[in-house]
Amino acid sequence: MTLKVSDIGEKELVKYIIANSKKITPDDTAVTPFLDLNLISTCDMLIQSRHFPKNMSYFDMGFKAVTVNVSDLAAMGAEPLGFLLSIAIPKDLEVDSFKQIIDGVFKACDYYSIPLIG
């Protein structure tokens, strides 16, 4: 039997993210001192059936989720200071698929040299 995310629950999923990130804290918020600079935030919600080709891997979906937000910041001439992840997943998603998404997020954060901060 394949383990589903509904089998382990949200707390275990969050534990996986925290345990595998170099910069994340268990807080729900991140505070970045910015002095006289402007802090620009962005958040794009991507929907599997709308924003991803049917044959795109879960890893690539995670990578794209970071990339589209970095692109929005670049369009404004801003440098990303960190990435806040917001994800909605079906309760019957396989845990391995969830981990592939998150691994794609981690890889993109490494690629763009930005920490996953929450």
Language-model features: locations:
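Glycine-rich anion/phosphate-binding loops
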Residues: 22-23, 53-68, 92-103
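Extreme N-terminal cap/leader segments of soluble proteins
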Residues: 1-57, 76, 85, 107-109, ...
